[in-house]
């Protein structure tokens, strides 16, 4: 589409700060609706597109964008304007997200409430209406996570799992995850672990805790040695970047403002501790071990590998501005929280959280609904009226991890 017809750059405008001021000006001038919803945009030949990111490099990368792309196509058929295409595409993504997550959560044998609450947080709602791959990535990860949790529940109950049944249940979500974001594929480590445990049970093999600890320590040690050997010249610099990153008070690494082109704005800062507090209480309310302990610890390990792996990748890459908008974004980490329920169950056994009746569930639901109400309310007021439009863009560029 030729976006210059409505005053936008012809190329990838979401990576530049210009649209913020452009949109703000249009709102003040009263031309926003006319330009975005009434102005018809002509098609542009692929041969004239200089930003090749818009065309895609490999066919399988397009699978993640299939649903919003279909929405854009239908939106253009309805009316060839930016507003029509964006609204229909977001609607398609939202319907896809809601329906798939409903069936995923319905089939879960444990932690249904946790999956539900995390999936309706403001950052997840941004995934649900994303025009990018975020919705697909979240669903693919949640699907395979739920499948693995169900298998782990059966292992905890000492039910026999046939290898044929294992592969039949794991194949489709594994394929779906393969076409998602690269860091999400860390989940394959749990797939491998579950497979090994099933085979070991078939062969009647058993490992002691000491053997497991030694084996895990050796693997982690080898991984650390590889990084040290490969990046030894940069190690001190990277460590200092990590320290400054986690000490900086201004810019949160786990931000809800995941991309400059989000469909919603962040919730007010004062509400974060309330939301996190309710989520922590929900996690700690699960005291029954529903999956094996090795599964719980592996879920925690994968969260840590993902967190530090993503930060490490950005810390050592001097060309980060060429392929990211604001650096390490919340969407890289949020979906991994789904794997923390088992390990926090072990913690909950040490910290007792008791509730009478369904009061805890009601409180968590109330906080979640309030978060969504605030989130959508701020969005309705347009976030660029409430804070400096360049804040998010500048915070990514000036973040300590890039210095």
Feature annotation, model-predicted:
Residues 223-251, 356-403:
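Transmembrane helical bundles and short interhelical boundary loops of multi-pass, membrane-embedded
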Residues 26-27, 38-43, 67, 206-208, ...:
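Membrane-lumen/periplasm interface segments of multi-pass, membrane-embedded glycan/lipid transferases
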Residues 80-83, 101-122:
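Transmembrane-helix signature of polytopic, membrane-embedded enzymes
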Residues 2-86, 318:
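Interfacial juxtamembrane loops and adjacent helix segments
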């Amino acid at each position: 589409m030729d976006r210059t017809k409505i005053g936008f750059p012809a190329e990838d405008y979401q990576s530049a700060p210009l649209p913020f001021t452009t949109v703000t000006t249009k709102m003040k001038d009263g031309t926003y609706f006319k330009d975005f919803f009434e102005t018809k945009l002509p098609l542009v030949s692929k041969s004239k597109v200089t930003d090749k990111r818009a065309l895609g490099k490999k066919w399988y990368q397009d699978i993640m964008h299939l649903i919003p792309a279909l929405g854009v196509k239908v939106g253009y058929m309805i009316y060839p304007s930016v507003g029509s295409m964006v609204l229909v595409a977001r609607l398609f993504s939202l319907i896809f997200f809601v329906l798939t997550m409903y069936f995923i959560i319905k089939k879960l044998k444990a932690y249904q409430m946790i999956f539900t609450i995390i999936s309706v947080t403001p950052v997840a709602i941004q995934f649900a209406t994303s025009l990018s791959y975020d919705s697909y990535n979240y669903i693919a990860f949640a699907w395979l996570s739920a499948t693995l949790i169900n298998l782990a529940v059966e292992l905890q109950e000492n039910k026999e799992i046939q290898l044929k049944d294992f592969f039949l249940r794991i194949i489709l979500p594994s394929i779906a995850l393969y076409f998602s974001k690269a860091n999400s594929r860390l989940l394959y480590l749990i797939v491998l672990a579950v497979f090994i445990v099933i085979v070991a049970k078939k062969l009647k093999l058993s490992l002691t805790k000491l053997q497991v600890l030694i084996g895990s320590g050796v693997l982690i040690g080898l991984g650390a040695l590889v990084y040290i050997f490969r990046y030894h010249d940069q190690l001190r610099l990277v460590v200092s970047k990590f320290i400054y990153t986690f000490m900086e008070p201004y810019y949160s690494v786990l931000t809800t403002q995941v991309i400059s082109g989000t469909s919603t704005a962040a919730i007010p800062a004062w509400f974060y501790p309330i939301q996190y507090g309710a989520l922590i209480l929900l996690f700690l309310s699960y005291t029954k071990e529903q999956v094996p302990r090795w599964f719980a610890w592996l879920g925690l390990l994968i969260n840590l590998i993902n967190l530090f792996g993503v930060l490490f990748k950005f810390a050592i890459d001097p060309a980060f501005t060429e392929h990211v908008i604001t650096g390490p974004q919340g969407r890289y980490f949020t979906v991994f929280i789904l794997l923390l329920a088992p390990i926090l169950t072990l913690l909950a056994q040490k910290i007792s959280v008791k509730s009478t009746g369904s009061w805890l569930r009601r409180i968590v639901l109330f906080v979640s609904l309030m978060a969504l109400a605030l989130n959508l309310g701020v969005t309705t007021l347009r976030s660029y009226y409430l804070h400096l439009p360049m804040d998010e863009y500048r915070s990514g560029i000036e973040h300590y991890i890039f210095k």
